[in-house]
């Protein structure tokens, strides 16, 4: 029986490269046994609505072709449904944080090959109030860099554009009094920014969460406390090497649920796009979405449960089984 695939793509992403390559993508998927159709988004929110429609038509897989914003919209269209289809990703944005985290090929046909191989990984997603995200949520002036960086600069220098814009914004940064409740702990004080990460890659920084796991049911919470300009510049430099977590002005924690509030207005960034303002409640939805990934995805980025499921390692016996085996051997 042929499987049904629905491609939801942003025709303007990647200088319209996917739009021009679409006929070849459709042929390749058809030859691999997929009955495939495609939908081009026209405005903000289109990908979410189309993903919801695709669910009603019982597609086996939804393929998001575009940048992190398109992917976020597709995830929001399927996250609330109990029977979610598999998610395929063809990264077409400038940075493609989530695609980088999954080590997806940067070329279109390579990404299609990953989908055809049909190896999947169940990954965590986050819920912020009534919307979902798949990579990060953040607050603070510096977190606005992803949607304030000019498109022309991104097209010229790629992810390095965020570094340039980030250093440009440092002198404007002001600390805000925040209350952050996470699991059984509380941070109360002045902070310049906070980040909730689900993967290791955010705004081009691939080592921002050096110990990230895609499926452990926890956010990585990073809080940068009030600091001077020199300290901030040092933290940004350290972040490019994954060494910022040792800085005395950086709080680095793991948490399943987080509540953040402030008496001062603070904008939120969700998967690289404007996400409203505080207050916000965050909840990690463990292994909520099944995503097509390369077969050689790094094992250290997955929990033991996923590695057992993939056949990478054998399941460890329970304490009861160990005791029973010992009794038999005696």
UniProtKB/Swiss-Prot annotation:
Note on cofactor: Binds 1 Mg(2+) ion per subunit. This ion appears to have a structural role and is required for catalytic activity.
GO molecular function: ATP binding; ATP-dependent diacylglycerol kinase activity; metal ion binding
A Pfam family annotated for this UniProt entry: YegS_C
Keyword Nucleotidyltransferase: no
Binding site for ATP: 10-14, 41, 67-73, 94
Catalytic activity reported: a 1,2-diacyl-sn-glycerol + ATP = a 1,2-diacyl-sn-glycero-3-phosphate + ADP + H(+)
EC number of this enzyme: 2.7.1.107
Domain DAGKc: 1-132
Keywords of the record: ATP-binding, Kinase, Lipid biosynthesis, Lipid metabolism, Magnesium, Metal-binding, Nucleotide-binding, Phospholipid biosynthesis, Phospholipid metabolism, Transferase
GO annotation (BP), single: phospholipid biosynthetic process
Highest taxon of source: Bacteria
Cofactor: Mg(2+)
GO CC, alphabetical: plasma membrane
InterPro entries according to UniProt: ATP-NAD_kinase_N (IPR017438), Diacylglycerol/lipid_kinase (IPR005218), Diacylglycerol_kinase_cat_dom (IPR001206), Lipid_Phosphate_FormReg (IPR050187), NAD/diacylglycerol_kinase_sf (IPR016064), YegS/DAGK_C (IPR045540)
Active-site residues, record numbering mapped to chain: 273
Sequence positions that bind Mg(2+): 213, 216, 218
Subunit text: Homodimer.
Sequence similarity: Belongs to the diacylglycerol/lipid kinase family.
Cited function: Catalyzes the phosphorylation of diacylglycerol (DAG) into phosphatidic acid. Is a key enzyme involved in the production of lipoteichoic acid by reintroducing DAG formed from the breakdown of membrane phospholipids into the phosphatidylglycerol biosynthetic pathway.
This protein's name: Diacylglycerol kinase
């Amino acid at each position: 029986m042929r499987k049904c695939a629905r491609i939801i793509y942003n025709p303007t992403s990647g200088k319209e490269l996917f739009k021009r390559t679409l006929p070849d993508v459709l042929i390749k998927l058809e030859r691999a046994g997929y009955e495939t159709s495609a939908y081009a988004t026209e405005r903000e929110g289109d990908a979410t609505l189309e993903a919801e429609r695709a669910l009603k038509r019982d597609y086996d897989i939804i393929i998001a072709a575009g940048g992190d914003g398109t992917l976020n919209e597709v995830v929001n269209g399927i996250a609330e449904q109990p029977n979610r289809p598999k998610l395929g990703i063809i990264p077409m944005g400038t940075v493609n944080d989530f695609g980088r985290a999954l080590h997806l090929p940067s070329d279109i046909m390579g990404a299609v090959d990953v989908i055809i191989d049909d190896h999947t990984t169940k990954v965590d997603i986050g819920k912020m109030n009534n919307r979902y995200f798949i990579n990060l949520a953040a607050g603070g002036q510096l977190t606005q860099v992803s949607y304030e960086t000019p498109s022309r600069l991104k097209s010229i220098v790629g992810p390095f554009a965020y570094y340039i814009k980030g250093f440009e914004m440092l002198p404007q940064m002001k600390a805000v009094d925040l209350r952050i409740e996470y699991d059984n702990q509380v941070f109360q004080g002045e902070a310049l920014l906070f980040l909730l990460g689900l993967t290791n890659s955010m705004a081009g920084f691939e080592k921002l969460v050096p110990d990230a796991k895609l499926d452990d049911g926890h956010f990585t919470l990073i809080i940068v406390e009030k600091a001077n300009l020199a300290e901030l510049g040092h933290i940004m430099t350290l972040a490019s090497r994954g060494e910022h977590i040792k800085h005395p002005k950086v709080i680095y924690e793991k948490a399943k649920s987080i509540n953040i509030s402030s008496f001062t207005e603070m904008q939120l960034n969700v998967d690289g796009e404007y996400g409203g303002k505080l207050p916000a409640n965050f909840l990690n939805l463990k292994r909520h979405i099944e995503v097509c990934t390369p077969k050689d995805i790094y094992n250290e980025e997955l929990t033991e449960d996923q590695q057992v499921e993939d056949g990478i390692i054998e399941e460890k016996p329970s304490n009861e089984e160990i005791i029973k085996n010992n009794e038999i051997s005696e």
